[in-house]
């Protein structure tokens, strides 16, 4: 009885067309035409290689922008904005709670048992700004005004319990509803009022101190040249307010003290004989 030779392992799987896809024939990589008869482009081979090599979706990597972005400034602004948003949300919640407490106290004082008084005082004021973007913009403007030397001097020289309305500047209430123009005007007036507490020049900069001038010596010189100053006062006015021809004419009159022609015509002295 004849025995059939054994086939090598894996032969049946290859014969049955196994799970692994067949690689393209070597001759197909260098051909100039595709299967449909059109010319083969170099992009076609690159796209095919990329598709077989990487099966990740297009959203796997973050697309880069057209221009380089500064990561440090974006990160700092993002952190600052997040901190300001958290602080503003806490402040608006505290402000609403304060309004409710004050309103509840007024309601208890004014209530005399009648339902009309309770209904009139139980409503919460509706003129409260709750827009987060508006509150953050207003907070930035307030921070710019408070981050000054004038504001530091103001809070040190005038404590809170000594401040009087209408005399001392008061920070605008960012939680009240105002129009954009009204709020900007309040911020502008508040910053202008804070300039009253600006430091003097000698404290803020290293300028030389101006020494007082002794006017006694100037009086004697003024009495001697009073006649000349009276005649030349009108000419000096023309120097600053006149035409260039007048300016040139006045300059010649002022410089009459030194006569160039007389100096040139004067005979030279023999300095060797004098020595």
Curated annotation (Swiss-Prot):
Q: Do the record's keywords include Cell membrane?
A: no
Its Gene Ontology cellular component terms are: cytoplasm; cytosol; histone mRNA stem-loop binding complex; histone pre-mRNA 3'end processing complex; nucleolus; nucleoplasm; nucleus; ribonucleoprotein complex
Q: Which residues carry this modification: Phosphoserine?
A: 20, 23, 59, 182
Name the source's superkingdom. Answer: Eukaryota
Q: Which residues carry this modification: Phosphothreonine?
A: 61-62, 171
Q: Where in the cell is it found?
A: Cytoplasm; Nucleus
Q: Main localisation, per the record?
A: cytoplasm
* Protein name as it appears in the record: Histone RNA hairpin-binding protein
Q: Which organism is it from?
A: Mus musculus
């Amino acid at each position: 009885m004849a025995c059939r030779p054994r086939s090598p392992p894996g032969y049946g799987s290859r014969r049955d067309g196994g799970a692994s896809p067949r690689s393209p024939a070597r001759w197909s990589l260098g051909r100039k035409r595709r299967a449909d008869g059109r010319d083969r482009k170099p992009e076609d081979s690159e796209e095919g290689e990329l598709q077989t090599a990487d099966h990740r979706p297009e959203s796997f990597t973050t697309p880069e922008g057209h221009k380089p972005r500064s990561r440090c400034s974006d990160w700092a602004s993002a952190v600052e904005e997040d901190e300001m948003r958290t602080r503003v949300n806490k402040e608006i919640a505290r402000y609403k709670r304060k309004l409710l407490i004050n309103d509840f106290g007024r309601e208890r004082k004014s209530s005399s048992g009648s339902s009309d008084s309770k209904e009139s005082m139980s409503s919460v004021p509706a003129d409260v700004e709750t827009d987060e973007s508006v509150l953050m913009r207003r907070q930035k403007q307030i921070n710019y005004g408070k981050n000054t030397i004038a504001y530091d001097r103001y809070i040190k020289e005038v404590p809170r319990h000594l401040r009087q309305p209408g005399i001392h500047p008061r920070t605008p209430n960012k939680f009240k509803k105002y129009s954009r123009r009204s709020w900007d005007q309040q911020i502008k007036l508040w910053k202008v009022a804070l300039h009253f507490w600006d430091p003097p020049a000698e404290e803020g900069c290293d300028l030389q101190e101006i020494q007082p001038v002794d006017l006694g010596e100037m009086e004697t010189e003024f009495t001697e040249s009073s006649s000349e100053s009276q005649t030349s006062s009108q000419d000096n006015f023309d120097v600053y307010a006149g035409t260039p021809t007048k300016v040139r004419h006045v300059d010649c009159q002022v410089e009459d003290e030194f006569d160039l022609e007389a100096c040139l015509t004067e005979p030279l002295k023999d300095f060797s004989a004098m020595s």
